[in-house]
């Protein structure tokens, strides 16, 4: 009985895999990931706050109950930061429990917000919509915009099943693949512009590809402004992108053209980046070879980036990002040691300076020395030891560079057993005898 009691709730074993998946979510783009300690802190804090739920298993239903209760709490001024961290960590755990794999904490919070919007929409308008549109049930799990039988439209958040399906396709085939484009084009037919852009932003994918997609969207917006001067019946870029609109406003019939234009812009951007990815000389495919110096790699990379038909800010972003991600493992480690946490934001010149010696004989000797350097207790033991030859700390007498004194002839550089004068007979050939004494205190 004592053995069973000791295992009760210890470490939340039912959430072992969930916590493991949560530890892969990053705090922000390019930042560190959540740790197991973060997850356990959140779970134990929740158990402490809501003692009535402590004995219940950690199912997704319990998590939603806790989420709703946390929304109703008002933290003190000194605890607002910890409270926000608690909510963010819980959102990540909930996403992992549902099988989703958001890249960042912000993406996880966005997913839960979308689910939350769906739930609130169902509770507030479910009965009314069902009465006006009896055949709604077979459509409601896919389409955010629904035409009501009595006229008008109703908006609901993107269903998590659809979001998860898109996420799976993006992970398996790539964010700019034809498979993902087809899936997004199909579902986005009845999405608002805000839905399309939010879902696209939360998809897993290469950061450089996402930046290129955003650059293509900006180009489409600039082209629209040039070809469509402002007027009373002309859509603005903000209307097309869903800026400054509520979801209910964006779902109405007068925004159909704006939604379709936004959808087409996104599809065009995906195709453009995909064609760039498959074209010879694509910067994202330029990677440092094992025998190539970092300077030669940077020369090839910058040449490929400068040849791309993208804006200068996009080129700068690609140079800063790919100069690290596409470098060899040795160069990445050297940049991490030299530049630290700012390695992702460092300029190309700083990275070249950090990697100037990578591959040289001196660098290889340095790596070998680091590999052979004693570690742990053995490495710290010699620090407090004292040499009995010269009296200085930090090394032993057998390691002393000042040499040793022969107690037969009194000369330095050899021991008494190796003394040449010892083999000669006669006391007259023998030097003055040296009496051993304590080393001088230096």
From Swiss-Prot:
One of its GO terms (biological process) is viral budding via host ESCRT complex. Disulfide bonds: none annotated. A motif (PTAP/PSAP motif) lies at residues 436-439. InterPro entries: Gag_p24_C (IPR045345), Primate_lentivir_Gag_pol-like (IPR050195), Retrov_capsid_C (IPR008916), Retrov_capsid_N (IPR008919), Znf_CCHC (IPR001878), Znf_CCHC_sf (IPR036875). Signal peptide: none annotated. Pfam families: Gag_p24, Gag_p24_C, zf-CCHC. PROSITE patterns: ZF_CCHC (PS50158). SMART domains: ZnF_C2HC. SUPFAM superfamilies: Retrovirus capsid dimerization domain-like, Retrovirus capsid protein, N-terminal core domain, Retrovirus zinc finger-like domains. Late-budding domains (L domains) are short sequence motifs essential for viral particle budding. They recruit proteins of the host ESCRT machinery (Endosomal Sorting Complex Required for Transport) or ESCRT-associated proteins. Nucleocapsid protein p14 contains one L domain: a PTAP/PSAP motif, which interacts with the UEV domain of TSG101. Belongs to the Ovine/caprine lentivirus group gag polyprotein family. This is Gag polyprotein. It comes from Maedi visna virus (strain 1514 / clone LV1-1KS1) (MVV).
């Amino acid at each position: 009985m004592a053995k069973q009691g000791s295992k009760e709730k210890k470490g939340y074993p039912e959430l072992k895999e969930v916590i493991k998946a949560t530890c892969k979510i990053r705090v922000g783009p390019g930042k560190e990931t959540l740790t197991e300690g973060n997850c356990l802190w959140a779970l134990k804090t929740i158990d402490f706050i809501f003692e009535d739920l402590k004995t219940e298993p950690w199912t997704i239903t319990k998590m939603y109950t806790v989420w709703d209760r946390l929304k109703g709490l008002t933290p003190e001024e000194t605890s607002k930061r910890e409270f926000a961290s608690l909510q963010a960590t819980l959102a990540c755990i909930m996403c992992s429990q549902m099988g989703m794999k958001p890249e960042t904490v912000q993406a996880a919070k966005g997913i839960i917000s979308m689910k939350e919007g769906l739930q609130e929409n169902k509770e507030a308008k479910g009965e009314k919509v069902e009465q006006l549109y009896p055949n709604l049930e077979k459509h409601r799990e896919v389409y955010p915009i629904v035409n009501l039988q009595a006229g008008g439209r109703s908006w609901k958040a993107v269903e998590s099943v659809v979001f998860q399906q898109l996420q799976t396709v993006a992970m398996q085939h790539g964010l700019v693949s034809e498979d993902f484009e087809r899936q997004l084009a199909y579902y986005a037919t009845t999405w608002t512009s805000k839905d399309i852009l939010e879902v696209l932003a939360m998809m897993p994918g290469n950061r450089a590809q996402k930046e290129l997609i955003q650059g293509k969207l900006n180009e489409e917006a600039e082209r629209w402004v040039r070809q469509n001067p402002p007027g009373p019946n002309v859509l603005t870029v903000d209307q097309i992108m869903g800026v400054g609109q509520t979801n209910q406003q964006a779902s109405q019939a007068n925004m159909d053209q704006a939604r379709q234009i936004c959808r087409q812009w996104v599809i065009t951007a995906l195709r453009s980046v995909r064609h760039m990815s498959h074209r010879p000389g694509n910067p994202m495919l330029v990677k440092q070879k094992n025998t190539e110096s970092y300077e030669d790699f940077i020369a090839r990379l910058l040449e490929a980036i400068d040849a791309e038909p993208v804006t200068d800010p996009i080129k700068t972003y690609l140079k800063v990002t790919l100069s690290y991600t596409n470098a060899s493992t040795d160069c990445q480690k050297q940049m991490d040691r030299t530049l630290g946490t700012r390695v992702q934001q460092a300029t190309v010149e700083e990275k070249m300076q950090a990697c100037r010696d990578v591959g040289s004989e001196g660098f290889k000797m340095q790596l070998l020395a680091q590999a052979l350097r004693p570690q742990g207790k053995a490495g710290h033991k010699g620090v407090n030891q004292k040499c009995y030859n010269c009296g200085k700390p930090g090394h032993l007498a057998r390691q002393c560079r000042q040499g040793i004194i022969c107690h037969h002839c009194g000369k330095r550089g050899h021991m008494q057993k190796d003394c040449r004068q010892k083999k000669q007979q006669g006391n007259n050939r023998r030097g003055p005898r040296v009496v051993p004494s304590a080393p001088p205190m230096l």
